[in-house]
Amino acid sequence: MHSEAVASRSADPKGPSSRNGSNPPLDSVSLAIIEQLQEDGRRPYAAIGKAVGLSEAAVRQRVQKLLDQGVMQIVAVTDPLTVGFRRQAMVGINVEGDLDPVADALTAMSECEYVVMTAGSFDLMVEIVCEDDDHLLEVINRRIRAIPGVRSTESFVYLKLKKQTYMWGTR
């Protein structure tokens, strides 16, 4: 387990994307700070400041602003297996009608780690992390399929996690 800064389309798991214009564009210094934290979320502000040309206090202020704006989170990233979650799956969902109410219902479920609206074969893709197969079955069969508007689901159960990283930088 280690800490990383996760700069994402929506650092707030229930909030709107910071890429939809709700936040001003980031300058090169803020992007460099994010990259430093993606490498090590516990990196001292003084070390970041040295790398990006700012004082420790200025880095602290910028990091707080990035957190407050929902541009990034600083989180501990774990291997789900090591903390008791032995079953992960991606679930493709087709919806009748408006996607938002279904996406909102999925977002409220603690087992749903990612909920994305997509173009293609599925309207929504949801990553689910569960304790075991029985838990996964309960989430899909009794909870997801019971959401009004869900027309169909297709599950893609993970057999082996080969890579999990949040090091995409700030391209």
Give the ranges of each region predicted by the language model.
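A compositional/biophysical signature of low hydrophobicity enriched in polar/charged and small residues
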Residues: M1-R171
